[in-house]
Amino acid sequence: MQLRYFKSILPPADQYQKITSLTWAPNNSRLAAVSTDKVVYLFDENGEKRDKFKTKAAEANNPNTYIIRAMAFSPDSTKLAIAQSDNIVFIYRLVDPDTGAEKKSICNKFPQACAVTSLVWPKDRPNEVVFGLADGKVRLGMLKNNKSYTCYAHPENSYVVALASSLNGQNVISGHMDGAIWKFNFPAEEGGTPTSSQLVVHSCVPYSLGWGSCIAAAGNDNRVVFYDLNGREIRSFDYSNNDEVREFTTCAFNPSGDTVVFGTYNRFYMYTFNIQRNDWEEAGHKQIDNFYAVSAASWKPDGSKMTVGSMTGAVDMYDACVKRHMYKGKFEFTYVSKSAVIVKTLKTGMRIVLKSVYGYEIEKINIYHDRYLIARTTYTLLMGDLDTCKLSEIPWDSDGSEKFHFENERVCMVHYAGELHIVEYGRNDVLGTCRTEHMNPYLISAVVQEARGIASESKKLAYLIDLQTVRIQDLMAPVGSTLATVNHDTKVDWLELNQRGTHLLFRDKKRHLHLFSLSGQERTTLLNYCQYVQWVPGSDVIVAQSRNNLCVWYSVNKPDNVTMFPIKGEVVDIERHNHRTEVIVDEGINTVSYALDEALIYFGAALEDQDYERAVQTLEPLELTPETEAQWMQLAEQALATNQLVIAERCYAALGDIAKSRFLHKVVKKAQQAAKEFGGDGTDAWSVRAMMAQLNKQWPVSESLLLAQGKVDDAITLYQDNHRWEDAIRVADSTHHANAAALKQQYLTWLLETGQEEQAGAVKEREGDYLAAIGLYLKGGLPGRAAQVVMSVHNVNWDPALLDSILASLAKAGLYERAGELYEHMSRSSEAMQSYRRGHAYRKAIDLARREFPAEVIIIEEEWGDWLVTQKQMDAAINHFIESGATLKAIKAAIDCRQFAKAAGIIEVLDPREAMPYFRRIAQHYETTGALEEAERYYIRADMARDAVEMYSRAGKWEAAQRVARGYLTESEMRAFYRAKAAEFEAAHKLKEAEKAYLAAGGDDVDKAIAMYKRNKMYDQMIRLVTQYRKEKVPEAHTLIAQQLEVEGNLREAEKHFVEAKDWKSAVQMYRQVNQWEDALRVAKVYGGVNASKQVAYAWALTLGGDDGAQLLKKMGLLDHAIEYAVESGAFAQAFEMTRAGAKHKLPEVHLKYAMFLEDEGRFAEAEAEFISAGKPKEACDMYMHNQDWDAAMRIAERYDPTMVSEILVSQARVAVERKQWLPAEGLFIKAKRPEAALKMYRDARMWNDALRVAEQYLPTKVAEVQMELLSGQGAGGGSGGASADAVINKARGFERNNDYARAIETYLSLTAQDTSNQDQLEHCWGQAAQLAINYQRHRMKDVVNTVSERLQEIGRHQAAGELHESIDDAQGAIRAYCAGRLWDKARTLAGTNPTFSRYIEDQYNNYLLQNQQADELASRGGQHAQQAIEMYVARDEWAKVHELAAQQGPEVASNYALKHAERRFKQGDYAQAAQVFAQHGITAQPQYFELYKSIAQGVLHASQGDRNPVAEKSLRDMMYRLVNVLRSGGGAGKYKVDTDAFQNYYLAAHYLTCAAAAKEQGLKDIAAMNLTSVLRYVGPTIPADRAFYEAGLAWYEAGRKNMAFVMLNRFLDLSDAMDEPDSSAAVIENADFSDTDIPYDFTIPERAYCTESQREDVRNLVLEISMDRSSDQSLALKACEHCGKPTYEANLTCHFCKKKYDPCVVTGYPIQSYDRVVFKNNGPELNAIRDMWNKWVEAFGTDPVTGMQAAPMY
């Protein structure tokens, strides 16, 4: 324990102001402190002052000289007791109990005869406060009556100096002035006697006295002594020899009682109890200088704080803890003692004290779901809920492997060692225990329901004993009695009790939802498919989802009344808030909610609380629906059960049960009258009880109540009113009523009037009037009763006519047995025999026959057996057949009822030919029972040796199977047998046996043995078999093995196999990849020679690098070659490394090549360094010059190669010339000493003035030449050089003014777009030049206008150019200008009707449209333009427009573009789209495209299952239909017969697939299966065989024809197995089942499987299932040929006997019989079909299956 100073909450005064008392409120919310100033200060839990109030004297007139001796808070923290020295104890109320507001008022006061010296308020005693007096008495103040009583008095009236209460509040000790410590015990039970006794006499006055886990006392002798509860001293600490310790003044235990603080002068000592040593220890002391004596001390009830007060009024607060611990950053654990921890939620600041009630040390704490506490001590387990602040502690001993479950907020579930423990939060015991291994939270439901209203407390648990048994346990029973056990036939996967524990909901693995009522012990199935279910929180309403329906049960007592809503998504939750209940449904994109009827939900809550008025108010506003009707009924029944008659009357009135409502109204009136007479509610009155018994149909109860009151007539009337005449007559007879006889006659009359002749006849029979009784029986249609009367009454001569009438009635009623008895009674044996046999009363018939007709006994025995067989009583029929000698019938009956022992015994006497059909079934029986030898014998006798072999194989008796096979099977059967056994042995990993079986089978099965050893990595065995049987594949086998061993890391073995395969290079590569160069070099040297070893050595050197690699290469003479190779491959680091290590003479060359590489990479700075290192500065300069980095180039030239300076300057100047930067270029040329280049630059640019200037300055010899060029006119207008445009214009205007128009024109024209960006200015100048030419220079007018026009068009002024041409009547030039500027309307207007101009304009316009890809405009122009538009659309991939335009151009164009479109889609792999294009837009029959068509067909039909597209198959069908028609109509069918037949096959295969898909969608399963069977004719190149047989087999299985499904799925499995083997073909597959069919036999095995492996396994299981079905013959269906009458495969288009050919049905593909043919033709091809199939198709679709045209049934 550590005490750390926290804060001072009251500062010290400058004078004496003793803190006389400190006390904490038990709820930790307040601290009260008082000093000698008589003011009580109130602080919050953190020590902040919140309030204060001044105390009062005992009497208002008394002087204010009292002091406060002690204070204590009440256990509920709302009151404060103050003991005062002026002979009184005041109780202050601090909190208003009604409003919770803070309010200080005196609620109790206890005046005494002398001064009050001390006070305590024991725990859990809110109305009892204990205080001590100066006269030695300890008194008890009772708050309820405001009186005080003496608990005990000191014999010598010794002053009470201290009081202390035990931790549990059941005891109080007091310390007295004479050193005695007394103990007072409160009575253990109410009314008991309290006791008191002297505990011990302390060594001094025990001013400091406390009681924790033991009693501690100290005083002025400086000793601290600890006593046990009997007063024996257990430990003491003596400080009498310590001068720094003075007398002890106060004592305070922490809430756990294991730590205590004693105050003394300027310090306080702390002591703790060591559990391990079972002793008290000093834990240290706190020195507080200038604090003076500690006058008061108090611990906070949670143990986290300790406060002390001083003589000067100071109050200090200390933080007390053993340790602190942060948990997951969300919680803080403060260990205030070893057995108490404060758990604080950091987010909310909420605190809870986790404390062991047994005082054990808390070792570990965990918090689950941020809410639930789990703590451990050595012997207990602590649990708590942070939200409700409820804690529990239970004894616990485990190894820590228990699992906790917190799904239920009321209880904690602990699963350990197969047992489930239920602990309710807030209780320190285990609520219940059960054994279960199924600890899924969805498989356990616990209900803890507190008492509400009249409803009692309920605690129940539902759990699984096993996965099919639910047990419901009552947790309130002493040992947990079982309320119900629910046995179910399917595994349960969810269960939950409702909140009251009256009903259990559970769901099984089949998604069936069940409701179990605990009261009625009844189970009801609510749903046959349920994917979500939940009780609505806080109610008995059930919400469930069944597929797309939301189901709600508002009343669990009426499970048939369900409310359903259609929904689209999945129910995810149920939310209740703001008086609204909503079901949340996730629809994928969004979430929606469905509101439930809140009124009906509230009704359930009201009924649960038995608040019937509220229940009625809830139901009254609602309409009467099935839900509300059920709830009215539920309320009525519950109201009747609790005698709420008015409520029940209202309920039945609401239900429309007027009779019950009126009856209850009478009962209510009776009860009201009884209440007035006798008091109470009147329901106990005998008349009310009798009526209620009558209502509940408790007739004996009602009768006894009426007879007890002497109400005989009322009792008789009661029975008469309810038509219980016999009870009425019984009452009348028993009471000797005067009207008893009349009552009987009245009863008989009533029976006759109501048609109850049977009852009337029974009355007459009892009276002895037999004739009347017989007449009544016959009248009532009861001839059997009449015959019974005749046979039971003897010595009566009955009228023969009467007897004949009875016999006729018996025959008419079918009572032949009774008629036979009557005939026998009348000694008419023949008629009796006939009646017995007609009524199947064979026992009586045989008895009669043995007496009268012995010869007929055998006949009747067989007849009896036949009849028993018809009644499915085969077991009983066996003996009758044996008795009659019908042996075959006896055997059949014995087998049918599985009496095989009897059948075997009977069959031995039969002829073998007769017994043959039964041998197989008997053999199968013996096989199932394990009698294999007997089974073998019967299989052999049944000529089914193959089945005997398979039986022994299944049983694992291989030798016996071989014995039977060798003795009875054919060669082919033996081979099939060996294959099957080999596969079985391989699966069992019996590889030697499997090898023998494969080799015994021979042929391709040898490859299976080889593959088996390969799969099992037994490579030696594999090579042995390959060498022995497949010598040509030995190298390939070695290579495969080597590759596998390489992957596995077995390199030595892999090398061996590579070498054996003559592939040593792969071995070398293998070793290189794993850096085993020695081995690689060894293999290369041994098998590849010197050159190979050199290559490996070079590669090795590269990996070694540095000197090692170079030395290796040098040693082998490959160093130079390696360097060159490294440079060429860009491995410069290796190249440098090798060069420096062994070939330094090549270093400059490597630097140069590396520099060139860096230059190409754009890394110029690095390249520069490498060029310099290579001694090539010129190349570095060239690099920078190339990149125009002149400064860098100049820097290198000046430093390394000055001869390059001039060249760099010239290059830079030329770049400036290209950029027209004349002056910089001139300066660079001059600097490079190349003035002639500067002169040439200006002359080329016609800048004559600058050229003349340069010549005069630098080249005087060139001055004359330049002047001559200028004077010759080449420089006209150009003398301005770089002058501005304004200068040129001014110069031209000057020429105009001087009438020098020629030079003016040249000057205007000298102005170009390079001189100015002002296009308006340019247009004006050029226009002025043209105008001058027009006006004054007519001879050059046209040239000038053309020049101006060209320039205007260059700057985009086409309209101005055209108008210029028009001004000189140059229409052609104007039109050209307008067309160039796209001014088509102006051009057309100018052209008028001139055809030449118009044609030119349209050509230009078309060229413009083409150049700008304006396809729509081109298309609208038609003709060849449309063709051009189509090509544009093709380029843009706008195929819809392509086909639309192409269709307008004719079918040939349409088919050509369809071909282009399809080709493009085919190349993109979109076979479906390609087929659709041809189907929709036409197809050409040119032979060069036939391969394309076939490839598209194969792409569609050979698609994998995931890529398969029924729409694509339909498009392919339409495409091939078009193609075949085009070929036939164009005469190509004969010319290209093979191709046409192939296309026809593709068409038919696609047609049947399309029809099958459509039929399947409409539920026409037989048509779908027939179509898919017809597809089988085209397996191989047309459609993959595995897909065809797979789909056909599944279709027949869905259609219910298992024999067809078995054969086809079995073929599919054979194909799948063949596909797993390399180089397999269909020829190796057994074809017996398809030998006489038109299904191809020899075809290519597909390379890619159509189905997944899981689907193949499903098919295997399905085939196995069908094979086990003995009712299936497991062969293809046959039919009789119409021509020859022989049986042939039902889908054959050609009879395999007579070769008769049949037309295929367009609906199914099946052959059409002549008598069943219908022909349909409607402006299309003639369609032949089977009548029934056609009608089924047309009724489903309304169209024919080929063209899709409207069609009608044909009968």
UniProtKB/Swiss-Prot annotation:
WD repeat extents: 14-53, 63-102, 111-153, 155-194, 198-238, 289-328, 487-525, 526-563
Cellular component, GO, one term: motile cilium
Protein role: Required for the maintenance and formation of cilia and participates in the control of flagellar assembly/disassembly at the tip. Involved in regulating the transition between anterograde and retrograde intraflagellar transport at the tip.
Start and stop residues of the TPR repeats: 597-628, 696-729, 754-788, 813-846, 858-892, 916-949, 988-1023, 1048-1081, 1219-1252, 1285-1318, 1355-1388, 1455-1489, 1586-1619
Pfam families associated with the record: TPR_IF140-IFT172, TPR_IFT80_172, WD40
Gene3D superfamilies documented for this protein: 1.25.40.470, YVTN repeat-like/Quinoprotein amine dehydrogenase
InterPro entries xrefs: Quino_amine_DH_bsu (IPR011044), TPR_IF140/IFT172/WDR19 (IPR056168), TPR_IFT80_172_dom (IPR056157), WD40/YVTN_repeat-like_dom_sf (IPR015943), WD40_repeat_dom_sf (IPR036322), WD40_rpt (IPR001680)
Subcellular location: Cytoplasm, Cytoskeleton, Cilium basal body
Keyword Cytoplasm attributed: yes
Protein family according to the UniProt entry: Belongs to the IFT172 family.
Domain of life: Eukaryota
Complex formation: Component of the IFT complex B, the core composed of IFT25, IFT27, IFT46, IFT52, IFT74, IFT81 and IFT88 as well as associated subunits IFT20, IFT57, IFT80 and IFT172. Interacts with microtubule end-binding protein 1 (MAPRE1/EB1).
Keyword Repeat appears in the UniProt entry: yes
PANTHER family noted in UniProt: IFT140/172-RELATED (PTHR15722), INTRAFLAGELLAR TRANSPORT PROTEIN 172 HOMOLOG (PTHR15722:SF2)
Signal sequence region: none
Annotated keywords: Cell projection, Cilium, Cytoplasm, Cytoskeleton, Developmental protein, Repeat, TPR repeat, WD repeat
Protein name per Swiss-Prot or TrEMBL: Intraflagellar transport protein 172
